[in-house]
């Protein structure tokens, strides 16, 4: 068997890599020291006729089986030899729509997807997709010039990133809230201008504004509301939950009725004793 393998290798005949229909398998390694490669399955992004998708089909490469250690930066670097890359997006499952472009935050990041992912790589030109599908590989995720942290080094880096600068965090939150308040004020001003103005079909949009002010969205206000709801539930829950609790409540109620009855009897006797007989 060993001799057959050597002959097959010497003859240059390589077995085809099994891959899903319509996909091209490209080997990828974490580093040059790794012997067994992992495989990325790539194809041009296509959708069924009549299905809407925001990804440009002629310039988008769809990739399956992306390992957890392969980040957007490393995937972009591995495929940069195929052409200029516009965007790289990793997702938990296939999606027909691009994620909305929002300003990146220094502190608030989307939750990382555990396990394997799918990727959408948008090239500047359609030729980049064709070049990526013809790659032979293996692609290297971590190189000497672009090291990808793993193991304890990654844990240390993640811990250091979790320690935030309070002043910088406050400035970012203040800037976000200022932009949010400005947006809400513009929407209210626009709604006030359009109030009572009929549209093209002659309909008038009626909006209702409550007299009571809305509770402030602060942590203290939220805690007060939660504490109030907790006390309200505590009064309702577990009341006469067990049979013995129901019996004790009933006995206490009867005892209170007897006590009240005796007090009423004494008060009536006292009133009778104080009453005087005056026939004339």
Curated annotation (Swiss-Prot):
Spans annotated as Disordered: 1-24
Origin superkingdom: Eukaryota
Subcellular location field: Nucleus, Nucleolus; Cell projection, Cilium; Cytoplasm, Cytoskeleton, Microtubule organizing center, Centrosome
Modified residues (Phosphoserine): 99
InterPro entries named among the record's database cross-references: Nucleotide-bd_a/b_plait_sf, RBD_domain_sf, RRM_Rrp7, RRP7, RRP7_C, Rrp7A_RRM
SUPFAM superfamilies: RNA-binding domain, RBD
Secreted among keywords: no
Entry annotated with the keyword Acetylation: no
Chief site of localization: nucleus
This protein's GO CC annotations: cell junction; centrosome; cilium; cytoplasm; nucleolus; nucleoplasm; small-subunit processome
Domain RRM positions: 59-159
Keyword annotations of the record: Cell projection, Cytoplasm, Cytoskeleton, Nucleus, Phosphoprotein, RNA-binding
GO molecular function, one term: RNA binding
GO biological process: blastocyst formation; cilium disassembly; protein localization to nucleolus; ribosomal small subunit biogenesis; ribosome biogenesis; rRNA processing
Chain intervals with Basic residues compositional bias: 1-10
Classification via PANTHER family: RIBOSOMAL RNA PROCESSING PROTEIN 7-RELATED, RIBOSOMAL RNA-PROCESSING PROTEIN 7 HOMOLOG A-RELATED
Assembly mode: Part of the small subunit (SSU) processome, composed of more than 70 proteins and the RNA chaperone small nucleolar RNA (snoRNA) U3. Interacts with NOL6; required for NOL6 localization to nucleolus.
Function: Nucleolar protein that is involved in ribosomal RNA (rRNA) processing. Also plays a role in primary cilia resorption, and cell cycle progression in neurogenesis and neocortex development. Part of the small subunit (SSU) processome, first precursor of the small eukaryotic ribosomal subunit.
The family this protein is said to belong to: Belongs to the RRP7 family.
Protein name: Ribosomal RNA-processing protein 7 homolog A
Gene field: Rrp7a
